[in-house]
Amino acid sequence: MSAESSPLALAKGRGPAPSSKLRKAVFEACGQRAEHASNLWLIYSARIGRNWVLTGDTEYLHFLCVEFDPEIESFDLKPQPEIVRLREEDRKTSFDAIVRFRDGHIECRELKRESEPPPEPEEQLRAALQAEAQEIAAKRHGGRYVRMVMADFEPFHLRMQNSLRMLRFLLAAKDEPLGEVRNAVALTLRRSGAPVRLDALAASVGGVAAFVYAAVFQMLQRRQLSLPMDTEVLTGNSLVGSSK
Protein backbone atom coordinates (compact mmCIF):
# COMPACT_ATOMS: atom_id res chain seq x y z
CA MET A 1 0.00 0.00 0.00
CA SER A 2 1.65 3.25 -1.09
CA ALA A 3 1.57 6.32 1.14
CA GLU A 4 -0.20 8.31 -1.57
CA SER A 5 -3.01 5.80 -2.04
CA SER A 6 -3.45 4.69 1.56
CA PRO A 7 -6.78 5.32 3.30
CA LEU A 8 -5.03 7.72 5.68
CA ALA A 9 -3.79 9.80 2.75
CA LEU A 10 -7.29 9.88 1.29
CA ALA A 11 -8.92 11.12 4.49
CA LYS A 12 -8.45 14.81 3.83
CA GLY A 13 -11.98 16.14 4.32
CA ARG A 14 -12.87 18.16 7.38
CA GLY A 15 -15.73 16.84 9.46
CA PRO A 16 -18.08 18.78 11.72
CA ALA A 17 -16.66 20.34 14.86
CA PRO A 18 -17.10 18.13 17.91
CA SER A 19 -20.12 18.92 20.09
CA SER A 20 -19.74 19.75 23.76
CA LYS A 21 -20.76 16.18 24.55
CA LEU A 22 -17.68 14.92 22.73
CA ARG A 23 -15.16 17.33 24.21
CA LYS A 24 -14.70 15.20 27.31
CA ALA A 25 -14.05 12.14 25.14
CA VAL A 26 -11.49 14.10 23.13
CA PHE A 27 -9.66 15.26 26.26
CA GLU A 28 -9.70 11.72 27.67
CA ALA A 29 -8.33 10.37 24.40
CA CYS A 30 -5.51 12.92 24.52
CA GLY A 31 -4.62 11.63 27.96
CA GLN A 32 -4.72 8.02 26.81
CA ARG A 33 -2.07 8.75 24.21
CA ALA A 34 0.36 9.64 27.01
CA GLU A 35 3.78 10.22 25.48
CA HIS A 36 2.85 8.52 22.19
CA ALA A 37 2.32 11.01 19.34
CA SER A 38 -0.52 9.10 17.68
CA ASN A 39 -3.32 10.75 15.73
CA LEU A 40 -6.78 11.29 17.17
CA TRP A 41 -9.76 10.45 14.95
CA LEU A 42 -13.26 11.74 15.66
CA ILE A 43 -15.50 9.35 13.73
CA TYR A 44 -19.21 8.75 13.24
CA SER A 45 -20.45 5.20 12.68
CA ALA A 46 -23.60 5.26 10.58
CA ARG A 47 -23.99 1.56 11.27
CA ILE A 48 -24.06 1.90 15.05
CA GLY A 49 -25.40 5.46 15.08
CA ARG A 50 -22.83 7.02 17.41
CA ASN A 51 -19.56 8.94 17.57
CA TRP A 52 -16.25 7.69 18.89
CA VAL A 53 -12.84 9.26 19.49
CA LEU A 54 -10.14 6.84 18.35
CA THR A 55 -6.58 7.17 19.61
CA GLY A 56 -4.51 5.95 16.68
CA ASP A 57 -4.32 5.22 12.97
CA THR A 58 -4.65 1.47 13.50
CA GLU A 59 -7.96 1.98 15.31
CA TYR A 60 -9.16 4.20 12.46
CA LEU A 61 -8.31 1.68 9.73
CA HIS A 62 -9.98 -1.02 11.79
CA PHE A 63 -13.15 1.11 11.91
CA LEU A 64 -13.12 1.52 8.12
CA CYS A 65 -12.89 -2.26 7.77
CA VAL A 66 -15.71 -3.17 10.14
CA GLU A 67 -18.19 -0.40 9.27
CA PHE A 68 -19.33 -2.15 6.07
CA ASP A 69 -18.26 -5.74 6.78
CA PRO A 70 -21.31 -7.86 5.81
CA GLU A 71 -20.36 -10.60 8.28
CA ILE A 72 -20.44 -8.27 11.31
CA GLU A 73 -23.60 -7.70 13.34
CA SER A 74 -22.35 -4.92 15.65
CA PHE A 75 -19.24 -3.56 17.32
CA ASP A 76 -18.06 -1.41 20.21
CA LEU A 77 -14.94 0.64 19.54
CA LYS A 78 -14.49 1.87 23.11
CA PRO A 79 -15.31 -0.96 25.53
CA GLN A 80 -15.06 -0.14 29.21
CA PRO A 81 -11.94 -1.37 31.03
CA GLU A 82 -12.43 -4.48 33.12
CA ILE A 83 -11.01 -5.87 36.34
CA VAL A 84 -10.17 -9.57 36.32
CA ARG A 85 -9.02 -11.72 39.21
CA LEU A 86 -5.76 -13.42 38.35
CA ARG A 87 -3.44 -15.27 40.72
CA GLU A 88 -5.14 -13.74 43.75
CA GLU A 89 -4.70 -10.21 42.40
CA ASP A 90 -7.02 -7.79 40.61
CA ARG A 91 -5.69 -6.72 37.21
CA LYS A 92 -7.13 -3.98 35.01
CA THR A 93 -7.38 -4.82 31.33
CA SER A 94 -9.18 -3.47 28.28
CA PHE A 95 -9.84 -4.13 24.61
CA ASP A 96 -9.72 -1.74 21.68
CA ALA A 97 -12.86 -3.26 20.13
CA ILE A 98 -15.45 -5.95 20.73
CA VAL A 99 -16.91 -7.28 17.48
CA ARG A 100 -20.03 -9.45 17.24
CA PHE A 101 -20.50 -11.45 14.05
CA ARG A 102 -23.74 -12.54 12.43
CA ASP A 103 -22.91 -16.20 12.99
CA GLY A 104 -22.84 -15.53 16.75
CA HIS A 105 -19.13 -15.57 17.53
CA ILE A 106 -17.42 -12.65 19.27
CA GLU A 107 -13.90 -11.28 18.97
CA CYS A 108 -12.34 -9.11 21.68
CA ARG A 109 -9.66 -7.26 19.76
CA GLU A 110 -6.43 -5.57 20.75
CA LEU A 111 -5.09 -3.28 18.00
CA LYS A 112 -1.41 -2.44 17.60
CA ARG A 113 0.42 -0.49 14.91
CA GLU A 114 2.92 -3.29 14.39
CA SER A 115 4.01 -6.56 15.91
CA GLU A 116 5.98 -6.06 19.08
CA PRO A 117 9.34 -7.76 19.66
CA PRO A 118 9.55 -10.41 22.36
CA PRO A 119 9.63 -8.76 25.80
CA GLU A 120 12.85 -8.39 27.70
CA PRO A 121 13.40 -11.08 30.35
CA GLU A 122 12.32 -8.79 33.17
CA GLU A 123 9.10 -7.97 31.28
CA GLN A 124 8.17 -11.51 30.26
CA LEU A 125 6.13 -12.27 33.38
CA ARG A 126 4.20 -9.00 33.14
CA ALA A 127 3.45 -9.60 29.46
CA ALA A 128 2.33 -13.17 30.16
CA LEU A 129 0.02 -12.03 32.96
CA GLN A 130 -1.46 -9.32 30.76
CA ALA A 131 -2.16 -11.82 27.97
CA GLU A 132 -3.76 -14.20 30.46
CA ALA A 133 -5.94 -11.37 31.78
CA GLN A 134 -7.06 -10.58 28.22
CA GLU A 135 -8.03 -14.21 27.68
CA ILE A 136 -10.08 -14.25 30.89
CA ALA A 137 -11.84 -10.98 30.02
CA ALA A 138 -12.64 -12.24 26.51
CA LYS A 139 -14.27 -15.37 27.93
CA ARG A 140 -16.54 -13.16 30.03
CA HIS A 141 -17.97 -11.85 26.77
CA GLY A 142 -18.32 -15.34 25.38
CA GLY A 143 -15.64 -14.52 22.83
CA ARG A 144 -11.98 -15.00 22.05
CA TYR A 145 -9.04 -12.63 22.36
CA VAL A 146 -7.63 -11.50 18.99
CA ARG A 147 -4.56 -9.33 18.47
CA MET A 148 -4.36 -7.37 15.20
CA VAL A 149 -1.76 -5.05 13.66
CA MET A 150 -1.94 -2.54 10.83
CA ALA A 151 -0.57 -5.04 8.31
CA ASP A 152 -3.69 -7.18 8.85
CA PHE A 153 -5.77 -4.48 7.15
CA GLU A 154 -3.68 -4.17 3.98
CA PRO A 155 -5.72 -6.81 2.05
CA PHE A 156 -8.79 -4.60 2.65
CA HIS A 157 -7.36 -1.49 1.01
CA LEU A 158 -10.28 -1.13 -1.41
CA ARG A 159 -12.86 -1.67 1.31
CA MET A 160 -11.30 1.06 3.43
CA GLN A 161 -11.16 3.47 0.50
CA ASN A 162 -14.79 2.72 -0.38
CA SER A 163 -15.81 3.09 3.27
CA LEU A 164 -14.50 6.65 3.23
CA ARG A 165 -16.58 7.43 0.14
CA MET A 166 -19.76 5.86 1.50
CA LEU A 167 -19.43 7.40 4.95
CA ARG A 168 -19.39 10.90 3.44
CA PHE A 169 -22.81 10.27 1.92
CA LEU A 170 -24.17 8.68 5.09
CA LEU A 171 -22.90 11.49 7.29
CA ALA A 172 -24.45 14.13 5.03
CA ALA A 173 -27.80 12.31 5.11
CA LYS A 174 -27.83 11.10 8.71
CA ASP A 175 -30.75 13.38 9.67
CA GLU A 176 -32.78 12.57 6.55
CA PRO A 177 -35.69 10.08 6.68
CA LEU A 178 -34.64 7.63 3.98
CA GLY A 179 -37.19 4.86 4.54
CA GLU A 180 -39.20 5.65 1.41
CA VAL A 181 -36.01 5.93 -0.64
CA ARG A 182 -34.86 2.50 0.57
CA ASN A 183 -38.24 1.04 -0.37
CA ALA A 184 -37.96 2.58 -3.84
CA VAL A 185 -34.45 1.15 -4.26
CA ALA A 186 -35.63 -2.32 -3.24
CA LEU A 187 -38.60 -2.13 -5.63
CA THR A 188 -36.38 -1.03 -8.53
CA LEU A 189 -33.96 -3.91 -7.94
CA ARG A 190 -36.80 -6.44 -7.74
CA ARG A 191 -38.29 -5.20 -10.99
CA SER A 192 -34.93 -5.29 -12.70
CA GLY A 193 -34.15 -8.85 -11.71
CA ALA A 194 -30.47 -8.16 -12.42
CA PRO A 195 -27.72 -5.91 -11.03
CA VAL A 196 -28.19 -2.21 -11.81
CA ARG A 197 -25.54 0.49 -12.15
CA LEU A 198 -25.51 2.79 -9.15
CA ASP A 199 -26.03 5.96 -11.19
CA ALA A 200 -28.83 4.33 -13.22
CA LEU A 201 -30.48 3.18 -9.99
CA ALA A 202 -30.38 6.73 -8.63
CA ALA A 203 -31.92 8.05 -11.85
CA SER A 204 -34.71 5.44 -11.74
CA VAL A 205 -35.59 6.19 -8.12
CA GLY A 206 -35.52 9.95 -8.70
CA GLY A 207 -35.15 12.76 -6.20
CA VAL A 208 -31.80 13.82 -4.78
CA ALA A 209 -29.17 11.41 -6.10
CA ALA A 210 -26.99 11.81 -3.00
CA PHE A 211 -29.88 10.58 -0.82
CA VAL A 212 -30.39 7.56 -3.08
CA TYR A 213 -26.69 6.77 -2.72
CA ALA A 214 -26.98 7.09 1.06
CA ALA A 215 -30.02 4.79 1.09
CA VAL A 216 -28.11 2.21 -0.97
CA PHE A 217 -25.19 2.33 1.47
CA GLN A 218 -27.57 1.93 4.43
CA MET A 219 -29.05 -1.14 2.76
CA LEU A 220 -25.55 -2.50 2.18
CA GLN A 221 -24.88 -2.27 5.92
CA ARG A 222 -28.14 -4.13 6.56
CA ARG A 223 -27.28 -6.85 4.01
CA GLN A 224 -30.30 -5.91 1.90
CA LEU A 225 -28.20 -5.57 -1.26
CA SER A 226 -24.64 -6.07 -2.46
CA LEU A 227 -21.86 -3.89 -3.88
CA PRO A 228 -18.33 -4.89 -5.01
CA MET A 229 -16.67 -2.91 -2.22
CA ASP A 230 -13.74 -5.33 -1.85
CA THR A 231 -12.87 -5.69 -5.54
CA GLU A 232 -13.16 -2.25 -7.14
CA VAL A 233 -13.34 1.46 -6.39
CA LEU A 234 -17.02 2.34 -6.11
CA THR A 235 -18.29 4.74 -8.78
CA GLY A 236 -21.57 5.42 -10.52
CA ASN A 237 -20.76 2.47 -12.78
CA SER A 238 -20.61 0.00 -9.89
CA LEU A 239 -23.29 -2.69 -10.02
CA VAL A 240 -25.85 -2.90 -7.22
CA GLY A 241 -27.20 -6.41 -6.79
CA SER A 242 -29.53 -8.33 -4.54
CA SER A 243 -28.27 -9.46 -1.14
CA LYS A 244 -26.23 -12.65 -1.06
Regions found by a protein language model. Name each.
Residues M1-K244:
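Electrostatic, structured charged patches in enzyme active sites and in nucleic-acid/phosphate-binding
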